[in-house]
């Protein structure tokens, strides 16, 4: 088996119950692996099935999983898939992963990389990656031999955001445009609630909602845009997103992955987190000066949001300072650094010897 050219297997799911965040983390990482000419294969349970087109569009292969990650029978199916592909590494991403699951994968001789943004389990694998700013090293439990890649240097940023980083080196003139990006797991429909509030603010001329077509309330957002045509739009395509990123003056986010991608571009942000992991991330962004943390989304009132928006839009130096801090915080090279960490392990003499002995069909 040639370790240098072996493919990478991704075990992740994307469903309404478990969310799609970990799935898109894997897609971003797969794009970085392909830049190193690594084959990428997804073994995933997807809902809706149209997500398979997203996988294929990124030049990845996909095999449907019959069960959810961590459910009975999934471990055996994942091992069979890894042996069929002669995979050199398995990337596992999901909240239902247990230490025993990762330990059994490691016993096969495959390198195990796990995405974990919650630090909820003790990790026995080779690599643990947290693409968020928090939690930090002290929160994680891991066994001897496990390497951790945590923090801002390993934030995953899609190519569309990296390409706009240089173009948006200077802010565009008014009127002011706002971006609303609460991610795909916006089950409380904060995107619509906050967009309605932004439309009531005289300083905001237009609002662009960044989301995907499988957003839990996508059809409601479409109806809302139809009523407010001219001032509100939904942006789902990459080509449309490129122009909106350059023109945006302020963004409302929940502190998730898209918030860090907007930091790479340099757009000032107001964060209203909806999840504990996002809460820690949003607070760190505020500490670094890249965003203003307003509090949990359920607690922020219209008056608080209105005051925060006015402060940012009325002061160009405030926007400039936030933009510079954000660009210094996230440089867009996190995916490549994670690939480097994985390649170092794959090329180590200890791993190559174990892989030859253990990974048998």
Where are the language model's segments positioned?
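Conserved donor-binding/catalytic loop of nucleotide-activated donor transferases
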Residues: 246-249, 263-270, 288
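Active-site and donor-binding regions of nucleotide-sugar-utilizing enzymes
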Residues: 10-20, 25-34, 38, 45-144, ...
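A nucleotide-sugar donor-handling region in carbohydrate enzymes
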Residues: 124-189, 217-219
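A short, well-ordered alpha-helix in the C-terminal region of glycosyltransferases
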Residues: 311, 318-332
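Acidic donor-binding loop of glycosyltransferase active sites
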Residues: 246-258
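Donor-nucleotide binding loops and adjacent catalytic segments primarily
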Residues: 166, 172-248
């Amino acid at each position: 088996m040639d370790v240098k050219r072996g493919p990478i297997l991704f075990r992740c799911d994307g469903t309404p119950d478990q969310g799609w965040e970990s799935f898109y983390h894997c897609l971003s990482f797969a794009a970085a692996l392909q830049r190193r000419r690594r084959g990428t294969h997804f073994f995933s349970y997807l809902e809706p099935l149209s997500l398979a087109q997203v996988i294929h569009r990124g030049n990845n292969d996909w095999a449907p999983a019959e069960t959810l990650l961590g459910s009975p029978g999934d471990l055996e199916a994942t091992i069979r898939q890894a042996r069929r592909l002669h995979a050199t590494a398995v990337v596992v991403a999901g909240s239902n992963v247990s230490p025993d699951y990762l330990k059994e994968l490691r016993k096969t001789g495959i390198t195990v990389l796990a995405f974990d943004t919650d630090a909820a389990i003790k990790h026995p694998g080779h690599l643990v990656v947290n693409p968020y700013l928090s939690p930090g090293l002290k929160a994680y439990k891991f066994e001897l031999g496990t390497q951790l890649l945590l923090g801002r240097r390993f934030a995953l940023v899609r190519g569309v955001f990296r390409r706009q980083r240089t173009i948006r080196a200077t802010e565009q003139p008014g009127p002011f445009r706002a971006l609303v990006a609460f991610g795909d797991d916006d089950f409380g429909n904060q995107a619509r609630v906050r967009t309605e509030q932004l439309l009531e603010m005289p300083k905001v001329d237009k609002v662009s909602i960044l989301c995907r077509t499988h957003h839990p309330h996508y059809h409601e957002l479409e109806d809302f845009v139809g009523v407010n045509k001219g001032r509100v739009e939904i942006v789902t395509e990459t080509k449309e997103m490129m122009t909106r990123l350059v023109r945006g003056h302020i963004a409302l986010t929940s502190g998730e992955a898209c918030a860090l991608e907007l930091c790479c571009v340099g757009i000032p942000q107001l964060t209203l987190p909806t999840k504990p992991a996002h809460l820690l991330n949003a607070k760190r962004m505020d500490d670094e000066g890249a965003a203003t943390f307003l509090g949990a989304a359920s607690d922020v009132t219209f008056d608080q949001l209105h005051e925060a928006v006015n402060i940012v839009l009325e002061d160009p130096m405030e926007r400039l300072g936030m933009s510079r801090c954000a660009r210094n915080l996230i440089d867009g090279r996190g995916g490549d650094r994670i690939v480097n960490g994985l390649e170092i392990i794959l090329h180590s003499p200890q791993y190559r010897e174990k892989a030859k002995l253990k990974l048998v069909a």
